[in-house]
Amino acid sequence: TYPDPASRDPHAVRTVLNLSELDIRAGEILGIRGHNGSGKSTLLRIIALLEPPDNGTLLFEGRPAGTEDLHLRRQVTLLLQTPYLLSRSVASNVAYGLRVRGISSASELQNRIAASLLAVGLDPAVFLHRRRHELSGGECQRVALAARLALRPRVLLMDEPTASVDQQSAERIARAARHAADSGSAVVVVSHDHEWITPLSDRLVTLREGKLVE
């Protein structure tokens, strides 16, 4: 629930998400569609352990999970609609999260960076040393996705990943999502692009006013 700006009562709240149960499975792509304000992004933030639900429990492999569980939060990664990249090389951007997680071996960093770039359709020989200003919008999104794939997350969340990219990048992002699922990650994709998300998803649900309608 959030404060309701449409109400004159300063204490009034609006329920933006009201789910009884939703399973997310390893090795599967769960597609979530819905109009703006339907609760899609709120759901992703709860799954990403960025904010707690007001009621109910989020379970990870049968155990309660909370925002204070830093170990679990490192196993979940979120790709936003508008990617944020450092003003550095592509290699540095992909390596950043790996270094934060304590991976310092030069060979492992090199292998993970190369593999994740290939997974999103970017040739390391061409893109490794390019900087943010040398990339198109679609390439920036693919680099941001590569940085998350390099972490080998248990859960990969994607919030409108193709909203501002070209057709080629949208296709590459779909392939990368499938690769992540085939590698064992649970993948959750939010999109209002029905033509893109429908063939991609193993399961497809619709949110309407915070509730699952199908």
Report each predicted region and the residues it spans.
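Catalytic Walker B motif of ABC-type/P-loop ATPase nucleotide-binding domains
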Residues: 156-159
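The feature captures the beta-strand-to-loop junction immediately N-terminal to the Walker
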Residues: 33-35
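H-loop/switch region of ABC-family ATPase nucleotide-binding domains
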Residues: 191-192
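Conserved ABC ATPase signature
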Residues: 131-135, 139
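Helix N-cap at the start of a conserved alpha-helix in ABC-type nucleotide-binding domains
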Residues: 167-169
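ABC ATPase NBD coupling module
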Residues: 64-77, 182
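Helix-to-loop junction immediately C-terminal to a conserved catalytic motif
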Residues: 48
